[in-house]
Amino acid sequence: MKILVVLPRFPYPLEKGDKLRAYHQIVELSKRHDIYLFCVSHMKVTPESIEALRPYCKDIRVLRLNKVMCAINIVRNWFSSKSLQMGYWNTSHSKRGYKAYEREVQPDVVYNQMVRTMPLVARSKYPKVMDFQDALSMNTERRMERSRGLWHYVLHYEFKMLRSSEYNAFSFFDALTIISEADSEAIPHKKNGEIKIVPNGVDFDFFRPDAVTVPKEHDIVFCGNMSYAPNVSAARYLVEKVMPLVWAKRPSTTLLLAGASPKHSIWRLGLEDRVTVSGWVDDIRTAYASSRLFVAPMLIGSGLQNKLLEAMAMQMPCVTTSLANIPLGATNGDQLFVGDDAETLAEHIVSLLDNTELSTRIADSGHRFVHENYSWSAAVKPLEELLNAVVSK
């Protein structure tokens, strides 16, 4: 089968969740199908990144976005009641480029990621499957609820436009996929139960307990792209609300915040002597391996948290919130600990750091859980079956 994959970002390096998902889906699908990759990108894609995908793609086409035209499109969408981010990714240049590439490839099926790319492919004559990835409108709504002033107004506008786009997707595509049941239920359509659940997986060969050997320099680690609003919110909440309660009982407890592109507000958290902000890490496994406990106090966002899958695969005891655990489906008190306020999170952290036997039990149980439920080969299987079914109609 000839699959044309359409992405809003080049899927390498793997510092963002959408890139990680797309990369591993491409790797798995390429074992049995021909992959043609079309990406729009507002950043220069390095030759090294292209080469990382080359073994899995018959052809790769990257269309560089003009930021000035993107900005003009955002303004245009504001005044025409359309999603701002969809305007950013869908300029006349990107639409012409996609149509030309589609004519060249003549695929059996088009598979695009996120509503951001919907305007590129919605009118294609070929069978089409779109991956919502997660409920982007729900993510935006959660951010809106915690914002103030002009930004609250902008997010409220974008929330309404994304809800409309998610609803309209049912009219344009032969099938739709999403990362979790919770995200599917948040899509505003009476047929949201027909969306195919395609979870993420974890690379067990890469993320394994003995993958790297480094000293345990930190007690706690939180990893993620530190320019992404849900991660920024979680990091600040951890340092400003949770850690003071932990330090009241364990004054010497140390915390590592690891991940690409930290915002200024994240760098400032490192002014506390017991908090280290690393920025980009060449091998994120070293951040996990250098710490005793993984904590992800997610307050906003949507979808399945890859960082939790990776930490559990590295056999780390984990603490998170219900928001992150509902898509994951782990058992509180067995495979990880869940807390939805600073006091409960702090109690779990102190218990795990003070009780080696408990920490080991949670780590071992979580490790078994991800191995039994989150391999990439199993995760991509329902997607492959869906693509085959759409082509066979």
State each model region's role.
Residues M1-V62:
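N-terminal subdomain of nucleotide-sugar transferases
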Residues P8, K67-L84, V129-Y167, N225:
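Acceptor-binding helix/loop patch of EC 2.4 sugar-transfer enzymes
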Residues S137, L155-P209:
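Donor nucleotide-sugar binding/catalytic pocket of nucleotide-sugar-dependent glycosyltransferases
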Residues D174, A289-G303, M314-P317:
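Acidic donor-binding loop of glycosyltransferase active sites
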Residues P199-S290:
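Conserved catalytic-core segment of nucleotide-activated headgroup transferases in glycan assembly
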Residues K307-E310, P317-T321:
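Short hydrophobic beta-strand element within catalytic cores of glycosyltransferases
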Residues L336-E343, S351-T356:
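Conserved acidic donor-binding segment of nucleotide-sugar-dependent glycosyltransferases
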Residues L358-E372, A379-P382:
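A short, well-ordered alpha-helix in the C-terminal region of glycosyltransferases
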